[in-house]
Amino acid sequence: VSTADDRADLRTLAVLLRRMNGEINRLVHGFAGDQGLHATDVQALAAILDADEPMTPGRLREHLGLTSGAVTACVDRLERAGHIRRVRESADRRVVHLHYVADARVAARTYFRPLARAAQAARAGFTDDELAVVERFLAAINEELAAVRAPEV
């Protein structure tokens, strides 16, 4: 049973998460505009950068929830802009891996340096134990959100 306090706490958390998401989106859109990209292209770059294993167009499609045609257009834009390169797997030439180009990674790191500094400044006010709880929460909410699908209309 949900209490008024629980609902207020959830609302406060939702507002804070939306505000953080809005600030990150503002930076993402700025970077996209500066680079002549779409915001989705920047999401693709982040997915390629954060992947635990080499990213393929198919995995990128699943991650972004786009059609294969939309992913092809996105990858084409990123390659033309010099952000990524396609590399054929040596064992199976049909498999294509997407790699972030080093110079483009430097440009992104430079652009997003204020975000990194802000995160570091925010972290400085917390103990390691507190940060561990925050990291656990963020991992849990990301996992829950990944399982959410848009309702069918």
Kindly give the residue locations of the regions a language model identified.
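Charged, amphipathic alpha-helical coiled-coil/dimerization segments
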Residues: 76-132
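N-terminal leader segment of winged-helix/HTH proteins
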Residues: 1-35
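A structural signal for well-ordered alpha-helices, especially hydrophobic packing surfaces
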Residues: 21-24, 52, 142-146
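C-terminal regulatory/oligomerization modules of transcriptional regulators
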Residues: 1-5, 128-153
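Charged, amphipathic alpha-helical oligomerization/scaffolding segments
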Residues: 12, 16-19, 103, 114, ...
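N-terminal helix-turn-helix DNA-binding core of bacterial DNA-binding proteins
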Residues: 27-67
